[in-house]
């Protein structure tokens, strides 16, 4: 297996553009933990192990329980673990990430407008688009998560 490119080294302008999109998302009114939940779910769907690892740790640092992080992929079956807003965010994330299936459905979109308003819904859509782009970079360049054995060891 050959070593893949590092975008920051090879195409710094492209990397800077991605960082600018991240800066926009970071400055939105979306709750920080909600942003991490979006990032984890999209990364799971896209198979980006690096991003799943990174954002799972970020979510726990923000106060998410390990149980919540572990159940993100099974959020429908773990409805009692996630708030109504979190379930809506997860549904939006899946529909936008799997855009080739049906896209963001009208029912989901209208519920988002009702719950979050137009401005925040636009911010959420951009947050989902951003992590999907990062996931594609991560998968295409074969980014791998670091070993975190000490961090994950039971206490």
Question: Residues of each region from the PLM?
Answer:
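Hydrophobic alpha-helical segments
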Residues: 1-155
């Amino acid at each position: 297996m050959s070593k893949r490119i590092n975008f920051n080294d090879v195409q710094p302008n492209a990397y800077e553009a991605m960082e600018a999109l991240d800066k926009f998302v970071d400055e939105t009114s979306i709750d920080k933990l909600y942003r991490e939940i979006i990032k984890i779910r999209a990364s799971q769907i896209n198979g980006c192990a690096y991003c799943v690892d990174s954002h799972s740790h970020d979510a726990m640092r923000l106060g998410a329980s390990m149980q919540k992080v572990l159940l993100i992929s099974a959020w429908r079956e773990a409805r009692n673990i996630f708030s109504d807003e979190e379930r809506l965010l997860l549904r939006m994330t899946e529909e936008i990430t799997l855009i080739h299936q049906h896209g963001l459905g009208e029912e989901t979109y209208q519920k988002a407008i009702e719950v979050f308003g137009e401005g925040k819904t636009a911010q959420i859509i951009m947050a989902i688009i951003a992590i999907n782009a990062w996931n594609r970079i991560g998968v295409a360049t074969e980014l791998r998560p670091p070993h975190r054995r000490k961090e994950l060891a039971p206490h």
